[in-house]
């Protein structure tokens, strides 16, 4: 799920071969509300056929983190060199490298 256009989402999926890891895609155009409303995250969980307790959101923006918090979905805030002035206080964990999201490191949260 991304608030980006489906064209952008498809480009990223194709470039990185992500299709095999996801059961569907949702873009901002598919929604009535935008972040920080949790609609996009709840729809993604529903599309995946998963209970929100089994889901994790990786977000790099204040609005995305707030949306995850409002949806009661575990949120890993991704802090990069390109994200500035974001509020990570509502995230469950803050990471600066995707290696920090390995199953062995985050399984204690589920």
Where do the PLM segments sit?
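Conserved phosphate-coupling serine/threonine residues in phosphotransfer and NTP-handling enzymes
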Residues: 2-4
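Asp-based, Mg2+/Mn2+-dependent phosphohydrolase catalytic module
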Residues: 6, 10-110
